[in-house]
A protein has these predicted regions:
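Hydrophobic alpha-helical transmembrane bundles of multi-pass membrane proteins
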Residues: 1-356
Length: 356
């Protein structure tokens, strides 16, 4: 939040002087353009509500990475990565569209209503690079095959996903940037339908593939539906949102299997949900809804490619530099014992700890 306040906000929204460009900067700190009134910044919101809302989006991009590198990354290097990635990569990408940059000035402007690419794919690319350079958790992949390492509390994970679903009403609904009941209610409906359809898509595909009802796939299917609808939540109809969510949920199953096959260990499926789901949702804007068309699809492809190349290169540079200097992975003994006691000198679940 502090980084976003002092550097990132004015890097992401540098002003009209940088329209159509790939980079701009309006100075450090929070400061209104000359002559503007903070209480009348825009018809639907103020300067400071805009700041705090967008700051939460930036935080989201960083937290996406944490899931893919869980249980083996050093805390210090991860904090360093988060500061640099959110401080440099995220605002530059955001400026390309939301700050009036080159993606917004295409003949058919790139469209990303609430961040399938600008938030979720940005986090997903960082997650992919981080998981690859860290390597898998101890015992995840053996000569005998892949070993499942289940989460410690599936009911809590389920509650967490439903809390995320509820939070998405603020994520997508807030992106209307006004309290207009017609627009906000439409976004609420498309968001919820996509989430529900994502659950069904993941349930059906996982059952056909594994012959069991895999609740973890269903939970990630919900999230994939939410990520997928985020790019065009204000442009989709009822059937559009159901199709986008259903396909997104089904894609998750194949994506999780694919990344396990190439031995990229992602404990929570963050890469599949946010990167794969974000790409799908961004492309879906050119296929479904009010903006569908070849010109829009081309712009969406261009946006996905530009953001992907920049984010991959930036996250690789940061993670690789940290790996060569401070190191990014904890010692094998620390990983086996658990990061809570070694990084924080305390345990999350002391009643279940060894009494040696």
């Amino acid at each position: 939040l502090l980084t976003y306040a002092f550097v990132v906000f004015n890097l992401m929204y540098p002003g009209a002087d940088f329209a159509g460009s790939i980079f701009g900067f309006a100075g450090f700190g929070l400061s209104l353009p000359e002559g503007w009134d903070s209480s009348n910044y825009n018809a639907g919101y103020t300067y400071f509500t805009d700041f705090i809302f967008q700051a939460m989006f930036a935080a989201t991009a960083a937290t996406i990475v944490s899931g893919a590198v869980a249980e083996r990354i050093k805390l210090g290097p991860f904090i360093t990565f988060s500061l640099l990635y959110v401080g440099i990569c995220y605002p530059i990408v955001g400026m390309w569209k939301w700050g009036g940059g080159f993606l917004n000035e295409l003949s058919t402007p790139f469209y990303d209503f609430a961040g399938s690419t600008i938030v979720h794919s940005v986090g997903g690319w960082g997650a992919l690079v981080g998981a690859y350079l860290l390597g898998p958790r101890i015992g995840k992949y053996t000569p005998q095959g892949m070993k499942a390492i289940p989460g410690h509390n599936l009911p809590m994970a389920t509650i967490g996903v439903f809390l995320l679903w509820f939070g998405w009403f603020g994520f997508n609904g807030g992106s209307v940037l006004s309290a207009d009941p017609g627009s906000v209610s439409r976004v609420f409906v498309t968001t919820s339908l996509a989430a529900a359809a994502g659950a069904i898509g993941a349930l059906i595909v996982s059952f056909l593939k594994f012959k069991t009802y895999d609740i973890t796939m269903v939970l990630n299917g919900i999230l994939a539906g939410l990520v997928g609808i985020t790019a065009g939540a204000d442009q989709m109809g009822v059937l559009d949102s159901v199709i986008i969510g259903f396909i997104g949920g089904g894609l998750i199953v194949f994506s999780v299997v694919f990344f396990d096959k190439i031995q990229i260990d992602d404990p929570v499926g963050a890469i599949s949900v946010h990167l794969v789901g974000g790409i799908w949702g961004t492309l879906a804007v050119g296929i479904f809804g009010n903006l569908a068309g070849w010109g829009q699809l081309y712009s969406q492809l261009l946006g996905v490619a530009a953001v992907g190349l920049f984010c991959f290169a930036t996250s690789w540079l940061i993670f690789f530099s940290l790996k060569r200097t401070t190191g990014i992975r904890v010692h094998e003994n620390e990983e086996t014992e658990g990061l809570d006691i070694n990084e924080h000198s305390m345990r999350a679940y002391p009643d279940f700890a060894s009494k040696d």
